[in-house]
Regions:
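Bacterial N-terminal signal peptides
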Residues: 9-18
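Intrinsically disordered, low-complexity Ser/Thr- and Pro-rich stretches
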Residues: 2, 18-19, 23
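Cyclophilin-like peptidyl-prolyl cis-trans isomerases
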Residues: 21-236
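Bacterial N-terminal signal peptides that target proteins for export
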Residues: 1-10
Length: 236
């Protein structure tokens, strides 16, 4: 009887060792570590320019924008300001101007620039600032002008977006690619037709344009309150 008793004790001891050496579920939750390489989605090449394309020049800008416009068909953007946001539609008829605006938007050029010129009951003009970063962005993107496209029948109705001429005196009315203005005057500013290129229009939020146009300005027509903007492409 005693011998049988000790056999039972030894058997239980052996079973206990075996059980203690086997794995048991851990009640503490831990993050799972994947043993396989994660799948990383590659960013779309659409809208990306080669480093060799920049900075753009008077010789390279138009061929670049022609190619860029064909590869980037977006035509809507949102402009955010301290007084609210508004949406714009860019016209297909003005190929280079549409492509240029989309290109600069994707370069984040407009972010941090201002509506720096306000003429009451006439226009608001944006795309410039007195910040160092704006000049740096322009140097990186390039020095170039856009040709006029004024024979497409588009008129300077209230709410349209147009391209101001360069400050450089030229008989061909070449436009500064970095700035734009929006007609606030009602029903329009038709005396501008034929001299400036209409390339888009406001499709939502014209009340925001009116609010910016009502801001007090200094003698240079610069708003006393900086109207910083942020521009994003809507239909990517």
């Amino acid at each position: 009887m005693q011998k049988h008793y000790w056999k039972c004790i030894l058997y239980c001891f052996f079973v206990g060792i075996v059980i203690s050496c086997s794995s048991t579920p851990n009640t503490t939750k831990k993050p799972q570590v994947a043993t396989s390489k994660p799948v990383v989605s590659k960013p779309s090449q659409k809208g990306l320019e080669k480093k060799s394309d920049l900075p753009l020049t008077a010789e390279t800008a138009i061929p670049f924008l022609q190619r860029y416009g064909a590869e980037n068909r977006e035509n809507k953007a949102r402009i955010e300001t301290p007084l609210g946001s508004f949406d714009i539609l860019l016209f297909e008829q003005t190929l280079y101007h549409r492509a240029n605006f989309i290109f600069l938007t994707k370069q984040n050029y407009f972010d941090g620039t201002y509506f720096h010129r306000v003429v009451t009951d006439f226009i608001i003009q944006g795309g410039n600032s007195d910040n160092y970063d704006t000049g740096q962005k322009r140097r990186k993107i390039g020095k170039y002008l856009l040709p006029p496209d004024t024979r497409n029948g588009l008129k300077h109705h209230r709410g349209v977006i147009s391209m101001p001429s360069s400050q450089i005196e030229n008989q061909h009315k070449l436009a500064s690619p970095y700035e734009f203005f929006i007609v606030q005057q009602s029903p329009g500013a038709y005396h501008l037709d034929g001299n400036y290129t209409v390339f888009g229009k406001v499709i939502r939020g014209m009340d925001v344009v009116d609010a910016i146009n009502a801001l007090p300005t200094d003698k240079r027509e610069w708003p006393l309150t900086n109207m910083r903007m942020r521009v994003t492409v809507l239909n990517q």
